[in-house]
Amino acid sequence: MRECISIHIGQAGIQVGNACWELYCLEHGIQADGQMPGDKTIGGGDDAFNTFFSETGAGKHVPRAVFVDLEPTVIDEVRTGTYRQLFHPEQLISGKEDAANNFARGHYTIGKEIVDLCLDRIRKLADNCTGLQGFLVFNAVGGGTGSGLGSLLLERLSVDYGKKSKLGFTVYPSPQVSTSVVEPYNSVLSTHSLLEHTDVAILLDNEAIYDICRRSLDIERPTYTNLNRLVSQVISSLTASLRFDGALNVDVNEFQTNLVPYPRIHFMLSSYAPVISAEKAYHEQLSVAEITNSAFEPSSMMAKCDPRHGKYMACCLMYRGDVVPKDVNAAVATIKTKRTIQFVDWCPTGFKCGINYQPPSVVPGGDLAKVQRAVCMISNSTSVVEVFSRIDHKFDLMYAKRAFVHWYVGEGMEEGEFSEAREDLAALEKDYEEVGAEFDEGEDGDEGDEY
């Protein structure tokens, strides 16, 4: 089997996790208590969904997941929520005191105490796998736990499971909407370790997803639940090929191989189509070509950056539902002719496609319409650098005055770590610049030879 272990860290990670497991259960027909009436092979048969769920002898399906937070309130919601019987109590790990939006608390003082317990639980899950493929890590980098404990766990996972791939689903701070003053510090410090310890990181940003909910679903004031349900559709589409048998299956390691041209250039944009409310879906024909086009729309991107400002290096299209390869090829051919969608000159093909025949499911009473087919796109575009340069700019403004730094130093960090992390990100911005402008110098030189 190709099992994946999901690790949900901090409030954002846990709440996105709730939405994901709710959706997985719906897709596989698993009830809230873990029983699965439709499952014929009791006791861990070789079903495709066993990549995400382990089966007990009693026929109960338990998610291969760990939820970690430094304070109990968010995890208590899982412990008392609809799916409380789904998870093993040992999988829900909560501390007693908060990281207080402070990377240093999450990474050094408070996080240190809980990290061994987390690794112990992860080890138990890993021992239960026959062929562990990798980890899906869910966190946000603006807060204290997601950034601090998140990067600490990633560092330790690299030591313990060096060869296993790690996919990050990371919520980055939005340009306008902010949840804490020290977000820029936490994000820069955390990205420093994401750079080294994740293989692929998919950037999400609340503001971009708010806008999608407002525009496409006509929700005037979206809640986090609305946002998370949309994000969970993306994550479900990515992992569908691991959980169902499909026509063109895509493995977690394949994302890495196809999307990451250089190890550091591994921050991805994601988009999903069709995002459409039930009232509208009734009146629209959503063909493969149409949903493919809308996945490339700048307004569909789940992070606030404009792909028209950069070039694509590679992109991965995951279709699900009533889709045949012929339609996909036609849709991709059309995309390639568009002037607005530019690829770097050193990557002429640039498309990886996957098809899964399982149509997308929706949460009953949710906002999304039930549709016949959907596509999720993960793309590696140089425009992602906008996300980093925005955060770096805010970081510089605060750090020039050393504002709030004493809170971090007081928890045992050194000021040098700030400048080290900031330099690493400056190097990353430069890397993106060079990747986008790979062959321009050469072309200018050649023109002289013609006459």
Curated annotation (Swiss-Prot):
PTM comment text: Undergoes a tyrosination/detyrosination cycle, the cyclic removal and re-addition of a C-terminal tyrosine residue by the enzymes tubulin tyrosine carboxypeptidase (TTCP) and tubulin tyrosine ligase (TTL), respectively. Acetylation of alpha chains at Lys-40 stabilizes microtubules and affects affinity and processivity of microtubule motors. This modification has a role in multiple cellular functions, ranging from cell motility, cell cycle progression or cell differentiation to intracellular trafficking and signaling.
InterPro entries for this protein: Alpha_tubulin, Tub_FtsZ_C, Tubulin, Tubulin/FtsZ-like_C, Tubulin/FtsZ_2-layer-sand-dom, Tubulin/FtsZ_GTPase_sf, Tubulin_C, Tubulin_CS
The keyword Membrane is annotated on this UniProt entry: no
Record carries keyword Transferase: no
Sites annotated Involved in polymerization: Y451
Residues engaged in binding GTP: Q11, E71, G144, T145, T179, N206, N228
Residues at which Mg(2+) binds: E71
Swiss-Prot/TrEMBL catalytic activity: GTP + H2O = GDP + phosphate + H(+)
Enzyme class: hydrolase
Cofactor(s) listed in the protein's UniProt record: Mg(2+)
Location of this chain's protein in the cell: Cytoplasm, Cytoskeleton
GO MF annotation, one: metal ion binding
Active site: E254
Residues with N6-acetyllysine modification: K40
Binding partners and assembly: Dimer of alpha and beta chains. A typical microtubule is a hollow water-filled tube with an outer diameter of 25 nm and an inner diameter of 15 nM. Alpha-beta heterodimers associate head-to-tail to form protofilaments running lengthwise along the microtubule wall with the beta-tubulin subunit facing the microtubule plus end conferring a structural polarity. Microtubules usually have 13 protofilaments but different protofilament numbers can be found in some organisms and specialized cells.
Cited PANTHER family: TUBULIN (PTHR11588)
Role this protein plays: Tubulin is the major constituent of microtubules, a cylinder consisting of laterally associated linear protofilaments composed of alpha- and beta-tubulin heterodimers. Microtubules grow by the addition of GTP-tubulin dimers to the microtubule end, where a stabilizing cap forms. Below the cap, tubulin dimers are in GDP-bound state, owing to GTPase activity of alpha-tubulin.
Family recorded in the similarity comment: Belongs to the tubulin family.
Protein name: Tubulin alpha-1 chain
Annotated organism of origin: Zea mays
UniProt lineage: Eukaryota, Viridiplantae, Streptophyta, Embryophyta, Tracheophyta
